[in-house]
Amino acid sequence: MAAPRPPPARLSGIMVPAPIQDLEALRALTALFKEQRNRETAPRTIFQRVLDILKKSSHAVELACRDPSQVENLASSLQLITECFRCLRNACIECSVNQNSIRNLDTIGVAVDLILLFRELRVEQEALLTAFRCGLQFLGNIASRNEDSQSIVWVHAFPELFLSCLNHPDKKIVAYSSMILFTSLNHERMKELEENLNIAIDVIDAYQKHPESEWPVLIITDLFLKSPELVQAMFPKLNNQERVTLLDLMIAKITSDEPLTTDDIPVFLRHAELIASTFVDQCKTVLKLASEEPPDDEEALATIRLLDVLCEMTANTELLGYLQVFPGLLERVIDLLRVIHVTGKETTNIFSNCGCVRAEGDISNVAEGFKSHLIRLIGNLCYKNKDNQDKVNELDGIPLILDNCNISDSNPFLTQWVIYAIRNLTEDNSQNQDLIAKMEEQGLADASLLKKVGFEVEKKGEKLILKSTRDTPKP
């Protein structure tokens, strides 16, 4: 008498053939797992069967890696692999029981090994890309909100999978691998990332190439920028474009509608140290823009962006105090403003007030704003800080700031920041007020210039008094 046939597995009231032998059966499972009730009632044995098909089909990929001529024979195997990954991907959606069952079969290790083989093939046929993408989606879903799965994914995927996928020409593969990285990273694993900085740099490059993708930007803003150790280790190794990208996202974080939290402040104080020290060391690279030789716009733009970050940081009251006493920062800003100002007056160059029309996005526009932001930063550093107010006076910074306003009628933003800086320099500082009043009396600052920046000088008896004529602009 023949042995009885095994009963078909029951999946939430739907009959599924016990031995999953073909593509149509896998597709049926994939469709069933789109519904939560089917995922929650799936028999555990079904995942072993899917894994068996996955392993069997992966042999064809292994063969193609050893013998490229076999790539043409991958079609049926790739279809099965794709559907296995889709099935497992769907089964993991918001279902920790299935995540655990699939993980405990060592499916994660099999999937990662297979995905690495895909990258090794270097064949960009659509069927291979589809299998590649579905495999990454499965890894993302099995790790989602499941710390045990995240740990196993990290063990198998780091660093090779991320090094292979984050710079892949297919943007979906970049996005899905970024999703896995974002899902798997935690505080301890960030330390491992510090020892594999190429992965962190690849994330920044991925954001540059695919700014519309949410995962790279989430990794940078929600993870990288919360790790000052990683940023400090990574920053010197970034090229100028990558630095600008990172600094732009740092500015976006500081100026976001959501203010920095109490947890963010200590982290951004560490960032402030890095940004300020780098600016003090490298800010004179901007002077290359005034040379006759073709300038390195990217290097200058990176330095200009450092200044932009410092302006936004000093506009934050929680970060301002630290930067107001940062060694050499105020002195270097005044020195740089003086050199740029003199250079612009003596020769015709990018810092000259030539009033020429420039293309949108031209480095010339950025350079023009550089002077404005130097003055803005001086104003911020002097906000309610008498030591810095006096230091600017000692360094002859007040006449320098006023002279910039005198020659820059074409730059209303510069005039705005001159007004702001002079207000902060003279607030509760009679010595600086007297200096400006005496400059007007001696003809070193004419009345029309002072009026333009919001002041006028009154003479009461033998005493000169500097009076404000307008409200202080917001920083």
Swiss-Prot record:
This is Ataxin-10. Polyubiquitinated. It is found in: Cytoplasm, Perinuclear region; Midbody; Cytoplasm, Cytoskeleton, Cilium basal body; Cytoplasm, Cytoskeleton, Microtubule organizing center, Centrosome, Centriole. May play a role in the regulation of cytokinesis. May play a role in signaling by stimulating protein glycosylation. Induces neuritogenesis by activating the Ras-MAP kinase pathway and is necessary for the survival of cerebellar neurons. Does not appear to play a major role in ciliogenesis. PANTHER family: ATAXIN-10 (PTHR13255:SF0). The modification Phosphothreonine is found at residue 82. The keyword Cytoplasm applies. Keywords: Cell cycle, Cell division, Cell projection, Cytoplasm, Cytoskeleton, Methylation, Phosphoprotein, Ubl conjugation. One of its GO terms (biological process) is neuron projection development. The modification Phosphoserine is found at residues 12, 77, 430. The lineage of its organism: Eukaryota, Metazoa, Chordata, Craniata, Vertebrata. Belongs to the ataxin-10 family. One of its GO terms (cellular component) is cytoplasm. The modification Omega-N-methylarginine is found at residue 10. It comes from Macaca fascicularis (Crab-eating macaque). Homooligomer. Interacts with GNB2. Interacts with IQCB1. Interacts with OGT. SUPFAM superfamilies: ARM repeat (SSF48371).
